[in-house]
């Protein structure tokens, strides 16, 4: 069995230290095959926050891919946001949007953040044509028999969670990756765990909760994805739930 830990929205700068320690202990004890971090590592994209995030991820000792979340772009420093938005990522560079191949499972990144959008709320999702083209190109390199999981920060379409991604270009992107053979799209942003089918082709949309203090009434959580052959299930593991994983409806 392959086991992936899907974690999101850690928000260093507003992290929950107990939740960080809980997740780290689970990684050390269970040694998952890989960790998929679907964005919002930081709260305000400050250098100290990225340094703390990098130290934490490196300490886990497992293969990691990291997506860029809206909180990982400078908000108030517009020069940094437009000219050098990723300068503070240097220590994390090898993990950012890193494709992974793990025992017949391919993790393919899809960028859903933008430096600028023609709307007031830049925290919402956006899939540009170049980002989608890169993802589809990476998918074409995946062996035919692999399961393909797309890793993004924002849900490509909203699924009824308490907050929304409102991802522009998301429906088009979802249809494109489904047609190209994706089996699931993993995301964060909304801080709610979910696993729901989309359409008739078997594609699933899987969202992780948060390890930060911004839990919106639910305890901190992450997803464990268990894969056997061509079948996989999502378990939402919530801090403080005694010894039992909570199966997400899907």
What spans do the regions from the language model cover?
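N-terminal active-site segment of His-dependent metallophosphoesterases
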Residues: 1-59, 75-76, 95, 137
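Short acidic, glycine-rich surface-loop motifs adjacent to enzyme active sites
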Residues: 139, 143-159
């Amino acid at each position: 069995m392959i086991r992936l830990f899907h974690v999101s929205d850690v928000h260093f700068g507003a992290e929950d230290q107990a939740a960080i320690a809980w997740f780290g202990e689970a990684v050390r004890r269970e040694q998952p095959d890989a960790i998929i971090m679907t964005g919002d590592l930081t709260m305000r994209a400050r250098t100290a926050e990225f340094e703390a995030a990098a130290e934490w991820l490196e300490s886990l000792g497992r293969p990691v891919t990291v997506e860029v979340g809206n909180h990982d772009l400078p908000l108030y420093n517009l020069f940094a946001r437009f000219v050098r938005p990723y300068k503070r990522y240097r220590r994390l560079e090898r993990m950012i949007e890193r494709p992974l191949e793990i025992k017949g499972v391919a993790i393919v990144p899809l960028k859903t953040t933008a430096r600028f959008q023609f709307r007031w709320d830049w925290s919402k999702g956006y899939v540009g044509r170049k980002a989608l083209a890169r993802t589809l190109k990476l998918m074409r390199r995946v062996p035919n028999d692999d399961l393909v999981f797309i890793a993004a920060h924002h849900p490509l379409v909203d699924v009824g969670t308490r907050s929304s991604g409102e991802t522009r270009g998301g429906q088009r992107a979802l249809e494109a990756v489904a047609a190209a053979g994706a089996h699931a799209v993993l995301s964060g942003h909304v801080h709610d765990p979910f696993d729901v089918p989309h359409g008739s082709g078997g594609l699933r949309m899987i969202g992780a909760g948060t390890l930060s203090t911004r839990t919106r009434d639910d305890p901190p959580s992450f997803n464990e994805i268990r894969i056997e052959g061509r079948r996989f299930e999502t378990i939402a593991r919530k801090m403080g739930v005694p010894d039992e994983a909570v199966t997400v409806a899907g």
